[in-house]
C-alpha cells in the first residue's frame, strides 16, 4: 500500500470516528466480555442497530489492517480489535448519553523558546558564597551582567489535528522534550516563550484553566513502591472518574471495568496484586513498571497526551503494542497524541500521521510520515537497506552517519540552519503551511472549544467551582488520598511494625529510668524531666517525616500536572492518616511510661496525658513537614530544623524558667508548640499533688540552742514553691514559683497545642500549593567556570562534528584486548518466594569468544538482566547452579574487575564532572603499569567517540533536583565508565535503551570495534534496528521463565537465524523486515503476543542444541593456560590499597567541596545553635540559678552533637549507595571508602565545633580569666565529642541499608545517650540496672563530666535573693550560727537575723560532687571519648565490610 494512500485512509478514519475523550463503559459489558472477546452486550434496540454498523466498520478495519500487515507486519491483533470495538462502543454510548465531543487540535506558530546559557551556570562549591561576597566590593562586578541565552526551539511551526498522532524526532539537544513540555503548557523553567500555541482555538494563557487536559509523561518512572499495581491504577481512576457517566452506572463499576481493560491492554493483569517496587524494594520489572506509567497516564483522560520516550525499557514487541493502543485511542476517542521516540521501528513509525524532525531546535521537516523519507532522499541523502525510516531521518543530521548520494557532494545541508533553510524553501513546507492555515480557519468557524468547555464542565463533580481544573471534588480527592496513604503505609508492614516496636522498647527504657517517682523533693524535680523527655521522644520520632516529604516530591509533581488532585488535598489526607497512627504510637508509649513513671493514677489524668501528647506529636510532625515543603534541599531543612529544635527545647520552660529568659529571645516562649504541651502536662500532673519534704527540709540536724532537732515550725522545704509552717510543697505553688505556670491554664494550653497543629497544617497546604521544588522532568547543566560550550553556534557545531569525525576515523584499530573465551553451562537461578522457590533461569548455556558480539534478547521479564547478573557474579541473593569458565578454568578472584558491566540503572556520584567520573574509573581499573597520561588520553578518546566531549566539565548532578546531565547522557556515561576500564569481557544491559538512534549506532559501532580488537561481549538489547542488529554475530534468545529459545549464529543478513524459525513453520522473514522484530513476533513476545509453538521444547530437541553442547565441551577442554591477569597473579583490585585510599579520599573531598548545602548547612547549624544558645544564656553570673543555666548550656551543646548525627547519617547513606556500585565493579576495596568518609568529615567537624565555640563561649560568659588551659579544654573536648557524634552517625548508616531503618534505629540509640548522661537523671537516681552498665558505657556521660567539671571547677556561687530558700530564725543567734549546712551556705536576709536564706551550693565543685564527678577525671574523660571515637571508626569500617555487597 502506498504511503500516501495510507495517510488518506487515516484521515477518513479520523473524520468518521467518535469525538469524546472519556472512556465510558457500555452498560451490559462486563470485564469478562473484554477478556473473553464477547461483543454482544444486552442493550436496547437502538444499541443493537449500532452494533451492526460497528461490526461492518470492524470488518472494513480488518481488511485495511490485513492489507497493511502484508506490507509491514504492523497490523492489529485480535486483542487490538477488541480494544477498538470497546472504545467505539464506549464512544457511541457517551454520545447517546448527551456527551459533547472534545476535539482539541494543536496549532503552533513561530514558537521560540529561550533557555539560560550554560556559561553562567557554574558548579557551586564552598567558595561560591565567598566569591559572591568579595564581588560586592569590586565595582567592576556591580553592573548587572546580561545572562547568556540560547534558543532551545527556534521559530517552530506545526499543527496536529484532533485524533491524529504526531511523531517528534530529533537527536539529543534537538528540543523534542521542550516542545512536548510546552504543548502540555509547562513553561516555568524557561527565560521566555514566544510564539503562539492554541488548543482547539484556546490560547495557551487561557488553557491554564484546563490543567490536566494536556499532559506530559517523562521517560522516568515515578511511583509509590509499596502500592500494588491495582491500587496505583485504582487511585488514578478515583481521581479522574467523570461525573457524566452512563445512567445508573456506579463509580465502583466504572473503575473496575476501566482498570480491567487497561491492565489487560498492557499485559500486567497477572501482576495486578504485585507491589510496584523500586531499586530497593523487589516488585515489577523495569518493563512492567514502564507499562504502569503509560497506563496511569491514559487514566488521566487528557485530550492531548505528550509521550516523551515512553517506550524506554520495553522490548520491540511491547513498544509496538503500546503504539498501537495509542493509535486506537486516537482513532476512536479523538485523542491528540504527540510522542517522541529515540529508536522507533518502521512498524511504530507507520502508525503515526505526521512527523516533525528537529535539529538544534530548528524544524527541518514537518509533514506526512509517508513523504518524509523521500523528502530527504531528494535533498541528496541515501538510506541503507533495512535501515528504519526514523533512524534515517535523524541520521541525516549527523555527518558520521549520513550517506550522501553520488553527485550531491557539497550540495546537501550541513548545519541545522542549512537544513531549516532547505525545508522552508521546499514545496512540501508551503503545502503544510497551507493546510495549517485552512485548519485554523476551520477551527475559527466550527469553534470546537465550546463543546470542549461544556464537556469539561459536565465531567466535573457538581460541587466543583467553574474555575476548578480538577475532575473530582476536594472531599473526593481527600478520601481517595486517605485510602492510598493507608495502603502505602500498610504495604510497608516492616516499617510499620519496626516503628511501633521501637516505640515500645523506648517506652520501657524511659519508664525504667524514671521508675516509680516518689512524691518528695527528688520526685518533684525528676517529674519535670520525665514529662519533658516524653515530649522530646516524640519530637525525635517525628523527624522521619522530613525525609518522607522529600522522597515523594516527584510523584506529587507528576500527579499534580495530571490534575489528579490538589496538593493541599494530599496534605489533608496525610494529616487524617496521621491521627490513628499517632494515637496508637502515643498510646503504646503512654500506657508504659505513665504507670512506670508513677504519675497520678487517675483515668482522667491519664487520658489528658495521652491527648496532650497526641496533639504535641501531631504538631511536631506537621512542623517537620512544613520545613520540608518550604526547603529546596534536605540538608537545608535538616540544619534549619536543628536550630529550631534547639530553640524549642530551650524555650519551653523546662531548662530556662520564663522569668529568666532574656527579652531578645523570650518571645519564642510564646511561639513554641512545646511550651503549651509542657505547661499542660505539668499542670495535669502537679495541680492536685503535694510533695513531702520532711527528710529534706531545712534547717536540718540539731538546734544549737536546745541540742534537740529543729522544730518543724521553723523548717521549710528547700525548693521553689515552699511555704512557711508546712513540710509539703503544693504542685500548683511549685509551678508558679519555679516555672511561672498557672495550673488553671491546662485546658487552654491543650487547646493552643492543637491550634499549633492546625497552623502547621495551613502552612503545609499553602506551601505544597504554591511552591514547586522538583524539576518536572528536565535538567539544567552546570559546568566548571569558563568550561561551558557555546550553544547553537554554527562554527561550534562544525567543530564538534569534526572532532567526532576524527575520533571515528582514528578508532584505535591497534588496540589489543586481552579477552578470553567465557562459557556458561546449565545455569539455573532460583529465588525464595514465600515458602517456595521460583525458577528464574532454566538450563541456560552458551559462550562468548574474542572478536564476537552476542545479543541477548527476549520479551520483558524473560530473565535477560537476571542472566547477566548471574554471569557477571553480581547476584547476592538466591541460589545459582551451573558452571562458568574463563578459558576453560574456574573464575578467579579478579573476574569482577576484568569484567565490564553496564547496568540498567545509571548510578553515578552527582558531585563529579563527567570527565572526573571517567578518569576515576580509568585510574583505578586499568593496570597500574599504564601511565596516567595514557589513561587520560584514552578517556578523552572515549569522550569524543561517545559525543560527550562538550560534557566533559559538566556536573553529573541528579534528576531529582533538575541540575545535571540528562537521562540519555547518564546512560552514555554509564557505558563510558566501563569502557575506559579496558575490560577483558564486557556485559551490557540495554546500553542503547533511552538513547537516540545515532547515539545507539555510535555505541554499537564502538562496541563492534572493541569486539574486533579481541574483546568478548554480550549485550541485551530491546529495540534494535536492522542496522544495529547486523553488527552482532550471535544471539541468545530467551522466553519467559528464563528458558532458551535459540543460541547460535545470526548469519549474513540474519539468514541463519531466520531460517531456524522458518524451518519450524513460521512465515518467512521479508527482505525489508527487521529480523529482531520478526523473531520476537514469532516467539510470542509483547503484551498480547501468542504462539502455539513451545519454543524451549523445540530448542531442546534441535540439532543446533547438540552442536552447542559439543562446542561447549570443546571450548572447556581447550582452555588456555594463560591467566586472566597478564602478570599471572590474579588480583581482586588493579591498584594497591594505599593508592585506592588516596584516590578515593581525594574524590570524597571534591564531592564534599561541591556540596555547599551539606557543608554550609552543618556550619549554619553550628552558627544558629551557637548564637541561640549564647544569647539564651547571656553573660551568666555566679548565682545558683546561673550555675544551673551553665549546666543547661552544656546540655544544649550536647544536643547539637546528637542532632548532627541525623545530618551525617543521610550523607553517609547516599555515598554508600555509590560505593556499592563501585565495589561491585572492583574500583576499590571497602577499606578506602570507609576510612575516606571518616577522614573527610574531620575538617568540617572542626569548623562546626569552632564556630559554635566562638559564637557561644564568650557570649554566655563562660570565658575564664587566667584559665587558658580550661578554656582550651572546653574547645578540645567539644571537638572530640563532635567527632564521636559524626562517627556514631556513620556507624549507624553503615549498618543500615535504607533511610527508614536508620531513622528507626537512631532514636532508640539516642535515648541512651541523653537520658543516661547524668543531667536529666542524676547518677544517684539512675536505676541500678542501667547505672551498672549503660551509664558507664555512655560517652555522653564522660563528655558531660569533663566539660562540666572544667566549667565549674573554679566557679564560686553567690545566691541572689530569689535563689535563697528562706526560713525563720527564732533565736538571737546569727543565721550562720543557727544553721551550719553540709553543703552551701546560710546568710542573713534581714538586718535583725529574723529570716535566714539558704543557698544550696557555695561552689560549682559542690554541685558536681553530688553527681559523683571529679575534676581530676578531665584527662580520663578526653581519653575515653577518643576511645569511643576510635571504636566508632572501627564499627564504620566493620559494617561497611559486612554490607559492602548490594542485595540483588
UniProtKB/Swiss-Prot annotation:
Residues 136-385, 822-1066 form the ABC transporter domain. ATP binds at residues 858-865. It is found in: Membrane. Residues 16-41 are annotated as: Disordered. Belongs to the ABC transporter superfamily. ABCG family. PDR (TC 3.A.1.205) subfamily. One of its GO terms (molecular function) is ATP binding. GO terms for cellular component: membrane. It comes from the Eukaryota. Residues 16-28 have a biased composition (Polar residues). InterPro entries: AAA+_ATPase, ABC2_TM, ABC_trans_N, ABC_transporter-like_ATP-bd, ABCG_dom, ABCG_PDR_1, ABCG_PDR_2, P-loop_NTPase. This is ABC transporter G family member 9. SMART domains: AAA (SM00382). The gene is abcG9. Residues 490-717, 1157-1389 form the ABC transmembrane type-2 domain. It comes from Dictyostelium discoideum. The chain crosses the membrane at residues 494-514, 530-550, 579-599, 604-624, 634-654, 663-683, 748-768, 1157-1177, 1191-1211, 1233-1253, 1272-1292, 1299-1319, 1422-1442. The keyword Metal-binding does not apply. Its main location: membrane. It is a multi-pass membrane protein.
